[in-house]
């Protein structure tokens, strides 16, 4: 699974290929 904390980390680095970025609500994306 993908925890909010883990998603938040990927949102910060903006790795668009990562499934967390695709499946989580990232601010500004």
Swiss-Prot record:
Q: List the subcellular locations.
A: Secreted
User: What terms describe the molecular function in GO for this protein?
Assistant: potassium channel regulator activity; toxin activity
Which Cys pairs does UniProt list as disulfide-bonded? 2-20, 7-24, 11-26
Is this entry keyworded Electron transport?
no
GO CC terms in record: extracellular region
Expression across tissues is:
Expressed by the venom gland.
Q: Which UniProt keywords apply?
A: Disulfide bond, Ion channel impairing toxin, Neurotoxin, Potassium channel impairing toxin, Secreted, Toxin, Voltage-gated potassium channel impairing toxin
User: Is Nucleus one of the keywords UniProt gives this record?
Assistant: no
- Domain of life here? Eukaryota
| Domain remark text | Has the structural arrangement of an alpha-helix connected to antiparallel beta-sheets by disulfide bonds (CS-alpha/beta).
Give the free-text miscellaneous remark of the entry: Negative results: has no effect on Kv1.1/KCNA1, Kv1.4/KCNA4, Kv1.5/KCNA5, shaker IR or Kv11.1/KCNH2 channels.
- Give the family this protein belongs to, as stated in its UniProt record: Belongs to the short scorpion toxin superfamily. Potassium channel inhibitor family. Alpha-KTx 20 subfamily.
The role this protein plays is:
Reduces potassium currents through Kv1.2/KCNA2 and Kv1.3/KCNA3 voltage-gated potassium channels.
Name of the protein in question: Potassium channel toxin alpha-KTx 20.1
Q: Which organism is it from?
A: Tityus trivittatus
């Amino acid at each position: 699974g993908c925890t909010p904390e883990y998603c938040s980390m990927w949102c910060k680095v903006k790795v668009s290929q990562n499934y967390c970025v695709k499946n989580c609500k990232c601010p500004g994306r």
